[in-house]
């Protein structure tokens, strides 16, 4: 195991532009669930929120969209995913980001996020961690990057000072004018 030190970070000026500290070196850890291989990852922190970016060694999820590969991950490798983010090498608040080749030609990289419960459609602080890891690994073509996620295409930029801004997928309305009874005779209406 290699000892890692985080880089210095400063407080953000804007809520969408946050500095991300990254480890100087990645850590290699063997997982029996991966066929005895080694899964390579780097740990990063976005304002204290941990992200483990998996760069190599994860079992092949085959072809297809990131959403399709996310389903394969959930059905075939949920125990392995839990092992990656849980104790003793992780903890319950950790999010992992599996870097993949994108299926969508408009995207630079593909990524599937997961936590100790299962896959996530998207993760804001995880996206910032991924962008910083890609920069540190020399895998960014410019200061802008597009990521294919199960939730859709996410765009991000990284500034010279390390601040990262994310343009997330659009939110949508599942149901309009939903009535909920809080107590007998007391109704509230809202959208989901």
Regions found by a protein language model. Give the residues of each.
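Phosphate/diphosphate-binding glycine-rich loops and adjacent basic-rich segments that engage nucleotide
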Residues: 165-192
């Amino acid at each position: 195991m290699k000892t890692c030190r985080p880089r210095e970070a400063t407080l953000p000026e804007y809520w969408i532009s946050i500095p991300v500290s990254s480890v100087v070196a990645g850590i290699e850890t063997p997982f029996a669930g991966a066929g005895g291989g080694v899964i390579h990852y780097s740990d990063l922190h976005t304002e204290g929120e941990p992200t483990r970016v998996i760069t190599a060694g994860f079992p092949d999820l085959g072809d297809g969209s990131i959403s399709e590969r996310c389903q394969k991950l959930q059905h075939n490798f949920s125990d392995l995913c839990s092992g990656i983010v849980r104790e003793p090498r992780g903890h319950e608040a950790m999010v992992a980001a599996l870097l993949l080749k994108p299926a969508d030609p408009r995207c630079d990289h593909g990524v599937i996020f997961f936590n100790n419960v299962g896959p996530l459609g998207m993760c804001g602080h995880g996206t910032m961690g991924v962008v910083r890891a890609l920069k540190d690994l020399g895998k960014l073509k410019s200061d802008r990057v597009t990521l294919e996620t199960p939730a859709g295409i996410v765009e991000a930029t990284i500034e010279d000072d390390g601040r990262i801004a994310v343009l997330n997928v659009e939110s949508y309305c599942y149901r309009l004018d939903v009535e909920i009874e809080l107590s007998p005779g007391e109704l509230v209406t809202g959208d989901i």
